[in-house]
Amino acid sequence: GGDGSLTGANRFKGEWSSLVKELLETGKITKEVAEKHSHLNIVGMVGSIDNDFCGTDMTIGTDSALHRIVEVADNIIPTAYSHQRAFVLEVMGRHCGYLALVAGIVTEADFVFAPEWPPEEDWPEKLCKKLELERQSGQRLNIIIVAEGAIDRQGNPITAEGVKKIIVDRLEMDTRTTVLGHIQ
């Protein structure tokens, strides 16, 4: 997977004509076979849950990963609701927040952290204010989704544990984290 596979395929394509010529010169193929196979087309299918490859709507694996994230959120929500908890879900995606963003929309998350959109410096205050307002309006649970590559505007990582600490320290709200990792 990744750039190594694409680089190898490109190199193989570049060497194809010399390989065919060598086979012809050593008598392993005929002139007709060499002419018939003088050009090589390579087709690749991108397999990446991150959905971070240009030129494709959705990479293989993205839909399955998103399904797993939503499934986990669906399993967490009843517990969060009954215990009036906040849950911080950390999802994969390296430097691509696609999974976090779409999962945030589908699960109606209160806050989403994605690498492409580092939050403003006062994000902890805005997060806490949002959660307070939601609770004051009668909401019994909160969902916050953090992409694994999320950073602030200074390039510092934003992690599920870091977000949990802010919520617990500032709001004294019962908060749990779930890092999905490779189960998605």
Curated annotation (Swiss-Prot):
Name of the gene this protein is made from: PFK
Binding locations of substrate: 48-50, 85, 92-94, 148, 176, 182-184
Binding site for ATP: 2-5
Pfam families tied to this protein: PFK
Location(s) in or outside the cell: Cytoplasm
Protein name per Swiss-Prot or TrEMBL: ATP-dependent 6-phosphofructokinase
Regulation: Allosterically activated by ADP, AMP, or fructose 2,6-bisphosphate, and allosterically inhibited by ATP or citrate.
EC numbers for this chain: 2.7.1.11
Region (N-terminal catalytic PFK domain 1): 1-184
Catalytic center residues: 50 (proton acceptor)
Reaction(s) catalysed (UniProt annotation): beta-D-fructose 6-phosphate + ATP = beta-D-fructose 1,6-bisphosphate + ADP + H(+)
Domain of life: Eukaryota
Keywords: Allosteric enzyme, ATP-binding, Cytoplasm, Glycolysis, Kinase, Magnesium, Metal-binding, Nucleotide-binding, Transferase
GO biological process, any: canonical glycolysis
Subunit and interaction comment: Homotetramer.
Required cofactor names: Mg(2+)
Cellular component terms per the entry's GO annotation: 6-phosphofructokinase complex
Main function: Catalyzes the phosphorylation of D-fructose 6-phosphate to fructose 1,6-bisphosphate by ATP, the first committing step of glycolysis.
Stated family: Belongs to the phosphofructokinase type A (PFKA) family. ATP-dependent PFK group I subfamily. Eukaryotic two domain clade 'E' sub-subfamily.
GO molecular function: 6-phosphofructokinase activity; AMP binding; ATP binding; fructose-6-phosphate binding; identical protein binding; metal ion binding; monosaccharide binding
Residues that coordinate or bind Mg(2+): 3
InterPro entries: ATP_PFK, Phosphofructokinase_dom, PKF_sf
Pathway(s) of this molecule: Carbohydrate degradation; glycolysis; D-glyceraldehyde 3-phosphate and glycerone phosphate from D-glucose: step 3/4
